[in-house]
From Swiss-Prot:
Region: Disordered, residue numbers: 23-67, 89-113, 627-646, 651-726
Keywords per UniProt: Coiled coil, Nucleus
The organism's taxonomic lineage, starting at the top: Eukaryota, Viridiplantae, Streptophyta, Embryophyta, Tracheophyta
Annotated localization: Nucleus; Nucleus, Nucleolus; Nucleus, Nucleoplasm
KW Membrane (keyword) present: no
Gene name tied to this protein: NOC2
Protein name: Nucleolar complex-associated protein 2
Domain of life, source organism: Eukaryota
Segments of skewed composition (Basic residues): 42-51, 673-682
GO cellular component: nucleolus; nucleoplasm
Motif Nuclear localization signal 1 per UniProt: ranges: 673-680
Organism: Arabidopsis thaliana (Mouse-ear cress)
Alphabetized InterPro entries for the sequence: Noc2
Length: 764
């Protein structure tokens, strides 16, 4: 019985020692930085440490009493388990001032006494300067021996690196300090490349999957998560902090690409998730190079893995960023806007049901803006519709409906969208807004082709042929080539040129052929092409330009040939027009492209492409397939270790450190532009925009997607005015004032000449 009692007593002592050692380890694992912040918000932790210290002292007294009462058993313990008796309560007392780094995000209370700070600071260890050899030693201990201490040390160093240069005053609570950019780069490369895999092993994350929201929710109930979740939060929180400090595109791209693998852990930290979405949206909307692509992939990964937690925020934020990018438009920026639109459409595919809800709301807002313009007929209301933001939003939703036309969720918004586009095209039917109407026609053709629904586009096109500007001889000379794809409105002098007339007529022919070729195999082709054919014959009689007459006669002959081809096939069938069998009528001929109009449409497309290429001075091509992700887009998500390290070394190869002066020198081009503005001159781009009608009249800054905006009393367009004059007053606010000041023009012009001469002398 004595032996059994001895064993029980040994077990009891061992368990007490293990508990004490566990408490000691927990205290030793604490990060020194957060004790200052933690004790500001919670003073009860001091009591906790005191209770642990009291328990340790009590255990030490028990050992002393045991030696006095039962010296034989104490001797037995010395011989068989001497380690159990080696216990010192001062170990806890020495390390009782350190707290774990688990609160990286919560805001701390302010206003504690400076004396308390100084007392705590005295107990903290002296800061150590991190060297490259220390980083190598930590990484080796993690890789070879899988030591948890190495993980904690490298994360502390990572925190110090991310917060380097922060305005912390005389804060000495951090254990490490980074002194060189070489060490900073080394820490960043290693942690961003390897920490995701290390954390997954610690948390015993399933290896066969990258995880979803459900996986994380299950993981939060496990013991490894309770032990190591503060490491995950530390990694994600510090990474977010350094992302906000970075200025180099390659650094941000590499950091965001690596963080994408750990994005699933954000399901456990909702506030961090919102901040990451905000940062990624900012980089997507303003970044250059591969950064927008990587940001899109990051957001897409979040939407797929976390679902409803972030889908709404991502959709709304991306739509807002897209609209902001459409505020100021020129020929060079159209490609970027098209790319952003394709990114948004790609993101909508992650949750089509949620996409429908957002599409319904935003399309309804566009409809309300159009309705306001139709009801009020004010200059300001028209300008809200006839601007790039509104048109690009229509193109965005057109692309979305076309991309997901095979899915039933987005098909219901096709009809209201087509109604809005038709209303926009007919709002101000003048020659100066021909480019805008042609854009609307292209959108309607895309919708019709994607949904298989007939939309009466031909009337919008043949109405343009009857405009007086196209039936008069050109009084403005030949003029420069007009690219109608990059404009919403052309200038007054350009309307009177021969180049504008040719561009209008040829584009109308191209879009009309595109529309009719979609229904060239329809059983009702003769009926739907009858009225457009009559209107085209009328234009042939009225036009005085032989080149236009020749073009229209060729189109009419192709339409008649196609009608004859369809009528011959239709005479052989026995089903009624409302029969479902009508859908399969001439299906084989349509796939093979054997109808006369389909063959003619192919020729017209090639001619249009050649004409557009001759007008484009740069490599900007605007269209549904124009936006590409670029050469720097990652080919796959999985990278091997060497490739990962190489990319990291390429990104973190500069002497940049957080907190350093990131303000870059102003480019010489920007300086030149500013000098020209001061002298009153204009840049080449601005002059080109003035010639093409891309001036201030087409850019409206107060675009609001809401019907609640208060309207001011503006000039109302009456019905007795000439149509062109009315539209000029909408687009040119200075028209009225110029008539009033006509009498004082000479006086003003003399003063202007004198001022200009003075500026020229000062500039020289």
């Amino acid at each position: 019985m004595g032996a059994k009692d001895d064993k029980k007593r040994v077990k009891k002592l061992k368990s007490k020692k293990l508990e004490a050692e566990e408490e000691l380890n927990n205290v030793q694992e604490i990060d020194a930085h957060d004790i200052v912040m933690e004790q500001k918000s919670d003073k009860k932790r001091g009591k906790k440490v005191k209770s642990k210290k009291a328990e340790a002292e009590e255990h030490e007294e028990e050992l002393k009493r045991l030696q006095e009462k039962d010296p034989d058993f104490f001797q037995y313990m010395k011989e068989h388990d001497a380690e159990l008796l080696k216990f010192d309560a001062t170990e806890i007392e020495d390390d009782a001032d350190v707290e774990p780094d688990t609160d990286l995000e919560d805001t701390e209370k302010e206003g504690d006494d400076e004396a308390t700070k100084m007392e705590i600071a005295k107990k903290v260890h002296v800061q150590k300067t991190i060297t490259a050899s220390m980083v190598d030693a930590w990484s080796k201990s993690i890789e070879d021996e899988a030591k948890l201490g190495g993980v904690r040390s490298i994360l502390r160093a990572y925190r110090t690196a991310c917060h380097y240069g922060d305005d912390t005053g005389d804060d000495q609570s951090t254990k490490f300090s980074v002194m060189s950019s070489e060490v900073f780069n080394k820490i960043m490369i290693y942690v961003l490349s390897e920490m995701d895999g290390i954390l997954r092993k610690l948390l015993r994350f399933p290896e066969d999957t990258r995880g979803t929201k459900e996986t994380i929710l299950e993981l939060t109930n496990t013991r490894p998560w309770k032990n190591y979740n503060h490491l995950v939060k530390s990694y994600l929180g510090n990474s977010l902090h350094v992302l906000n400090q970075m200025t180099d595109t390659e650094m941000i791209t590499f950091t965001l690409r690596r963080l994408k693998h750990s994005s699933v852990f954000l399901a456990a930290f909702p506030s961090l998730l919102r901040k990451y979405i905000k940062v990624a949206l900012h980089f997507w909307g303003t970044g250059s190079g591969a950064l927008p692509v990587v940001s899109l992939l990051f957001l897409r990964d979040l939407c797929i893995r976390l679902g409803s937690d972030c889908v709404d925020d991502c959709f709304k934020g991306m739509y807002k960023a897209y609209v902001l990018n459409c505020q100021f438009v020129n020929a060079d920026k159209l490609k970027h806007i098209s790319f952003l639109g394709n990114c948004f459409i790609e993101l909508l595919g992650t949750d089509i049901s949620a996409a429908y809800q957002h599409a319904f709301v935003f399309i309804r807002q566009l409809a309300m803006i159009l309705r306001e313009a139709l009801n009020t007929k004010t200059k300001e209301a028209f300008r809200k519709v006839y601007q790039w933001k509104f048109i690009h939003c229509l193109e965005l939703w057109t692309g979305a409906v076309c991309a997901y036309s095979s899915q039933s969720e987005l098909r219901p918004v096709a009809y209201p969208l087509a109604q809005i586009i038709t209303g926009v095209a007919r709002l101000v039917p003048t020659a100066r807004y021909t480019p805008l109407r042609l854009r609307c026609v292209r959108m309607l053709n895309r919708l019709a082709a994607a949904t298989g629904t007939f939309i009466p586009v031909s009337m919008l096109l043949v109405d343009m042929l009857e405009m007086k500007e196209l039936n008069r001889p050109p009084t403005g000379g030949v003029g420069k080539g007009v690219d109608l794809r990059t404009l919403l409105k052309v200038s007054k002098p350009a309307v009177k040129t021969r180049a504008f007339q040719e561009a209008c007529v040829y584009t109308v022919v191209e879009e009309l052929v595109e529309h009719l070729s979609q229904w060239s195999c329809s059983v009702a082709f003769f009926e739907l092409s009858f009225i457009p054919t009559i209107r085209l014959r009328s234009f042939c009689k009225s036009t005085k330009a032989e080149r236009f007459r020749k073009e229209m006669k060729q189109l009419i002959s192709q339409i008649e040939a196609n009608s004859e081809f369809v009528n011959k096939k239709r005479a052989l069938i026995k089903f009624l027009p409302n029969d479902l069998a009508a859908e399969s009528f001439l299906e084989d001929e349509k796939k093979a492209g054997k109808t006369p109009l389909l063959q003619y449409a192919e020729i017209i497309r090639q001619r249009a492409q050649q004409r557009n290429e001759s007008l484009v001075e740069s490599d900007v091509i605007v269209g549904e397939n124009s936006a590409v992700f670029g050469k720097n887009a990652p080919s796959s998500d999985d990278e091997d270790d060497e490739d990962r390290m190489e990319k990291g070394a390429a990104a973190f190869n500069s002497s940049w450190l957080p907190g350093s002066d990131s303000k870059e020198k102003e480019p010489e081009e920007e300086k030149t532009k500013k000098k020209k503005r001061k002298r009153g001159g204009k840049s080449k781009t601005e002059k080109k925009q003035d010639e093409q009608g891309l001036g201030e009249d087409d850019v409206v800054e107060d675009f609001v997607l809401s019907s609640d905006e208060e309207e001011e009393d503006l000039f109302d367009i009456g019905g007795d005015k000439d149509e062109d004059d009315a539209v000029d007053e909408i687009a040119d606010p200075e028209t009225k004032t110029s008539k009033k000041t006509k009498g004082t023009y000479k006086t003003w012009h003399k003063a202007y000449k004198k001022t200009k001469k003075k500026k020229a002398r000062v500039a020289s």
